[in-house]
């Protein structure tokens, strides 16, 4: 889901808590990939 200004996104990680970087390896990898993709899409 994207906010109208396209600079914000929300993604729900089922079963994850507040500190996503401290979750299971699967969640951590997914979070880092999402962040990477978000940044690259805005700097190109």
Curated annotation (Swiss-Prot):
InterPro entries: AB_hydrolase_fold (IPR029058). It comes from the Viruses. Gene3D superfamilies: alpha/beta hydrolase. This is Uncharacterized protein 36. It comes from Vaccinia virus (strain Western Reserve).
